[in-house]
Swiss-Prot record:
Coiled coil location: none
Keywords: Dioxygenase, Oxidoreductase
Single GO molecular function: ferric iron binding
Database matches in SUPFAM superfamilies: Aromatic compound dioxygenase (SSF49482)
A Pfam family reported for this protein in Swiss-Prot or TrEMBL: Dioxygenase_C
UniProt entry tagged with the keyword ATP-binding: no
Enzyme class: oxidoreductase
E.C. number(s) listed in UniProt: 1.13.11.-
Similarity remark: Belongs to the intradiol ring-cleavage dioxygenase family.
Record's protein name: Putative dioxygenase RBE_0329
Length: 208
């Protein structure tokens, strides 16, 4: 009987390892996103995830409307809920339309003109699937001739991440994105979305 049980366990173990070759472990692909810092964040972030206007304001901007979205994960590839995500960027003219947090910066990178409703900054909170999204516009080419935005993710149990997201063709993805309001994309089927999965150092698995 003992010999039978031993043989059964050996056979079961071999089948598990055989199956694992056919189903690659995605956890091994979860690489921590590297930090890239930016000195031009706003003194005060707008509380909405729509950078095209302040809450209750009519949108009036000069540029191409886009969606920036993704998932926040911990280093074990577990989706992170209730993470604060901050995004800031220059407008189509290459300047930031707000007052900067830091004082020792190139003031020529900022503008006080109010001919556009574009705010240049926004805030989002991840849902229980770790998803976030922003409504924004394509910025002026500024870093290495690339169109990019800056993002920071904060969570009580994880190390804060700050990085740059390049809005290149390789990051374009489907408009089918979780809890995004369909009204934002239905009138414009050509509206482009850019996807970025952000991996923070640390683990939140104990919460699940």
């Amino acid at each position: 009987m003992k010999k039978f049980i031993f043989c059964f366990l050996c056979f079961w173990t071999l089948n598990i390892f055989a199956a694992s070759k056919g189903y690659p472990n995605k956890l091994n692909r979860c690489k921590i996103t590297r930090n890239i810092f930016n000195d031009y964040e706003p003194k005060v972030f707008e509380p909405t995830n729509n950078l095209l206007r302040k809450t209750g304001q009519i949108s009036r901007f000069y540029g191409e409307k886009v969606i920036i979205k993704g998932i926040v994960l911990d280093q074990n590839c577990v989706p992170v809920a209730d993470a604060k995500v901050y995004l800031w960027q220059a407008g189509s003219g290459g300047k930031y339309p707000y007052e900067p947090l830091k004082t020792r910066v190139d003031k020529r990178r900022f503008t006080g003109k109010k001919d556009s409703s574009f705010t240049g900054s926004g805030t989002a909170t991840t849902n229980n699937k770790g998803e976030y999204y922003f409504v924004s516009m394509l910025p002026y080419k500024s870093v290495g001739n690339l169109k990019s935005v800056n993002i920071r993710v904060e969570h009580a149990d994880l190390k804060t991440l700050e990085t740059r997201l390049d809005l290149s063709n390789k990051n374009i993805c489907s408009n089918e994105c979780g809890e995004i309001n369909p009204a934002l994309i239905e009138p414009q089927q050509h509206l482009r979305s850019y996807c970025f999965d952000l991996v923070l150092q640390g683990a939140t698995l104990k919460r699940y």
